[in-house]
């Protein structure tokens, strides 16, 4: 009986020592000064890490988010995000307003107008609709009317106007990437093609303006209203990082448009349409019903329906990948 009693007393003393040690650990007593890390604290950190790992992922909107134009100036600033990442920026240089697009997040789509090129087996017709509308970030004008002889037009393997060697060409491949260059002089590559829009010669090549931008304005770069050298003009370029740059101005010569693109980083560029009635670009806010349009170019006349209703001319849309 005495031995049993001594054993019970030793057990009680051992229990008290364990409780004391636990209390000291809770007060920082085993790890040094209060607030220090103790072995017991290290063990109890497991559940906290598990809770951190189980934190729910952030959910982004299922459509591009437009942040507004802000103050236009020479510095690029974000205007569109896709899944939390910047997909488009805006800047204004030499009086030229530019939208720059990250092709990893968005892609270019060529639309056929109801009159130009007219009805046909086109996948993308005279208005933006359906799932494309829900992923719409921006849209803007394409090139000259096809009966001017400015170049060819094809989409989805169907040809409206045959392509011409040497013409400035906006080539979109089936993987959704777009390149710009002179047809059969660097483009196309061997990739399957989704669409090609040609217009005149390259306005910018290897970061240099075409030699004719000052000396051959109407003959080389299109007839203008009233034969004016300075009119609304637009272009689409690509920079060294494969980002697309839409550039437009309500009043410029070809030289000014080209310089704006070069200052914005464009390596190659094709002039698009000119004159006030046909130069327009929009960003789109999403909500209920039709997206709300936001004009991009200061002073632009605009397009009836803002590319969300049938339009007679062909145009480009920028949509989320």
Question: Where in this protein do the model-derived segments appear?
Answer:
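Zymogen propeptides
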Residues: 28-162
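Bacterial N-terminal signal peptides
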Residues: 17-26
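Short beta-strand scaffold segments in enzyme catalytic cores
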Residues: 97-101, 168-172, 234-238, 279-283, ...
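Active-site environment of divalent metal-dependent phosphoester hydrolases
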Residues: 147-148, 276-279
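C-terminal regions of proteins
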Residues: 278-321
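Active-site neighborhood of phospho(di)ester-bond hydrolases with catalytic His/Asp-centered motifs
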Residues: 269-272
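Bacterial N-terminal signal peptides that target proteins for export
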Residues: 4-16
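Aspartyl protease catalytic domain
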Residues: 112-263, 267
């Amino acid at each position: 009986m005495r031995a049993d009693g001594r054993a019970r007393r030793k057990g009680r003393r051992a229990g008290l020592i364990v409780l004391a040690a636990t209390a000291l650990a809770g007060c920082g007593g085993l790890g040094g000064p209060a607030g220090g890390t103790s072995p017991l604290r290290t063990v109890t950190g497991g559940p906290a890490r598990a809770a951190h790992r189980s934190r729910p992922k952030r959910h982004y909107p299922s459509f591009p988010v437009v942040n507004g134009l802000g103050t236009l100036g020479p510095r690029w600033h974000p205007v569109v995000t896709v899944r939390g990442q910047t997909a488009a920026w805006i800047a204004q240089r030499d009086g030229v307003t530019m939208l720059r697009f990250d092709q990893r997040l968005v892609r270019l789509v060529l639309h056929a107008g109801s009159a130009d090129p007219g009805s046909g087996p086109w996948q993308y017709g005279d208005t933006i609709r359906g799932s494309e509308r829900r992923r719409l970030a921006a849209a803007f004008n394409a090139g000259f009317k096809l009966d001017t002889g400015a170049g060819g037009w094809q989409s989805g393997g169907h040809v409206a106007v045959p392509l011409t060697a040497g013409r400035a060409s906006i080539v979109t491949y089936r993987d959704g990437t777009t390149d710009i260059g002179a047809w059969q002089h660097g483009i196309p590559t061997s990739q399957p093609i989704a669409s090609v829009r040609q217009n005149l010669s390259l306005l910018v090549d290897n970061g240099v303006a075409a030699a004719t931008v000052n000396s051959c304005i109407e003959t080389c770069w299109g007839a203008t209203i009233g034969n004016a050298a300075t009119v609304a003009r637009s272009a689409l370029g690509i920079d060294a990082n494969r980002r697309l740059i839409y550039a437009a101005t309500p009043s410029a010569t070809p030289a000014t448009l080209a310089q704006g693109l070069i200052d914005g980083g464009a390596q190659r560029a094709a002039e698009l349409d000119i004159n006030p009635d046909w130069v327009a670009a929009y960003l789109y806010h999403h909500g209920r019903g039709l997206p709300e349009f936001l004009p991009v170019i200061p002073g632009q006349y605009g397009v009836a329906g803002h590319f969300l209703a049938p339009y007679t001319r062909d145009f480009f849309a920028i949509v989320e990948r």
